[in-house]
């Protein structure tokens, strides 16, 4: 993992979700820990893109993925509750409040960005829709960018266009596998937002309390996996 595009001191966290969420690692600037966790996830999930891939897995490979996803399926008859996953991730950030997020909360928290990876196909009844979750994050000045993680053949589906509309209408960037944009571009944009926020807060601090301001960017990566596992007995 190449951390050259991320300024040292910026904190990163990872939350995964299906019907419920699990924190893989909380906000941290321990990049050794982050690298270890992401490498482990990459090894477990590599090449798993369809039910056919799952059917071809060995029992050991299947168990590795089941272990990694443990804690994300604790509600019956519900999967992929995307809005709930976004809110759970946002709750990792200082100052975020469930239900009634406001600018008072935003003033107490650090600049933050969430990267949401999903195909936006919901099964079940979530507590928060994606739009409701984005309303809450926007109120507390958390930017949410979207990475469409479904198949290319579904990029024109209504669920995909709905996700694009929701993300972009709340100030985020929406990327698909085939739109020509890259993760590096997204990271650069996040860094640009961080630099602008630092500059603005510095100007404010020079007026209100010279020399006393501090700021760090919290970048949250949400990786969402559709769990269609069939237990092998």
Predicted regions, residues:
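Switch/connector loops and helix/strand junctions flanking conserved nucleotide-binding motifs
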Residues: 22-25, 155-156, 184
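Sec-exported extracytoplasmic/periplasmic mature domains
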Residues: 1-8, 39-46, 90-98, 138-139, ...
């Amino acid at each position: 993992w190449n951390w050259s595009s991320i300024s040292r001191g910026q904190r990163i966290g990872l939350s995964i979700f299906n019907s419920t969420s699990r924190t893989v690692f909380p906000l941290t600037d321990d990049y050794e820990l982050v690298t270890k966790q992401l490498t482990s996830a990459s090894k477990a999930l590599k090449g798993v893109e369809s039910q056919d891939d799952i059917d071809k897995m060995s029992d050991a490979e299947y168990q590795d993925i089941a272990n990694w996803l443990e804690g994300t399926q604790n509600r019956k008859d519900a999967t992929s509750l995307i809005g709930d996953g976004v809110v759970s991730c946002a709750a990792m950030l200082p100052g975020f409040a469930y239900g009634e997020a406001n600018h008072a909360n935003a003033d107490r928290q650090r600049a933050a960005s969430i990267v949401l990876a999903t195909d936006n196909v919901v099964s079940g009844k979530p507590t928060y829709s994606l739009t409701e979750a984005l309303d809450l994050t926007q109120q507390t000045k958390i930017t949410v960018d979207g990475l469409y993680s479904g198949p290319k053949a579904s990029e024109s589906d209504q669920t995909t266009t709905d996700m694009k509309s929701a993300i972009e209408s709340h100030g985020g960037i929406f990327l698909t596998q085939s739109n020509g944009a890259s993760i590096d571009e997204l990271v650069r944009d996040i860094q640009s937002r961080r630099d602008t926020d630092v500059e603005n807060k510095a100007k404010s601090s020079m007026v209100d309390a010279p020399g006393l301001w501090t700021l760090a960017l919290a970048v949250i990566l949400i990786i969402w996996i559709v769990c269609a596992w069939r237990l092998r007995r």
